[in-house]
């Protein structure tokens, strides 16, 4: 039977990345924040679900704020100072996540909305009758 070899030390090497891009995907059910370098390699990420929220609470602005703070904290540990922010989706945590990134100590140089809009593509789901 093969023996498992135990590795010691940090799992991921710390890199010095001064600027990057924060991708905020905000849906009605969750908010995902990924911070990448300029080449697109993910430095840190977090989501409302990964921050400990479950169910309907994942879609709240407070959950988005918590997720953005967690991702920003890890990015600051990697040496990140300046970020561009790309926001995608219609969720309620968009503005809150951007504000949380700024409060965490990251300098925001650009905010761009990259929500995909169909040019009359697929048929929309039927309306909910509650």
From Swiss-Prot:
SUPFAM superfamilies reported for this sequence: Translational machinery components
Any GO molecular function: structural constituent of ribosome
Keyword RNA-binding: yes
InterPro entries (UniProt xref): Ribosomal_uS11 (IPR001971), Ribosomal_uS11_bac-type (IPR019981), Ribosomal_uS11_CS (IPR018102), Ribosomal_uS11_sf (IPR036967)
Organism superkingdom: Bacteria
GO BP term, example: translation
Any Pfam family: Ribosomal_S11
Gene3D superfamilies in UniProt: Ribosomal protein S11 (3.30.420.80)
GO CC aspect terms: ribonucleoprotein complex; ribosome
Family: Belongs to the universal ribosomal protein uS11 family.
Assembly, per entry: Part of the 30S ribosomal subunit. Interacts with proteins S7 and S18. Binds to IF-3.
Protein name: Small ribosomal subunit protein uS11
Originating gene: rpsK
């Amino acid at each position: 039977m093969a023996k498992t070899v135990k590795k010691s030390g940090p799992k991921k090497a710390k890199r010095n990345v001064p600027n990057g891009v924060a991708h905020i995907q905000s849906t009605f059910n969750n908010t995902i924040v990924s911070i990448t370098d300029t080449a697109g390699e993910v430095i840190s990420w977090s989501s409302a679900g990964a921050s400990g929220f479950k169910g309907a609470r994942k879609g709240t602005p407070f959950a988005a704020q918590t997720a953005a703070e967690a991702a920003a904290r890890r990015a600051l540990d990697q040496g990140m100072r300046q970020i561009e922010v790309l926001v995608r989706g219609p969720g309620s945590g968009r503005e809150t996540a951007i504000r949380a990134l700024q409060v965490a100590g990251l300098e925001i140089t650009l905010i761009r909305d990259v929500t995909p809009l169909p040019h009359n593509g697929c048929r929309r789901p039927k309306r909910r009758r509650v």
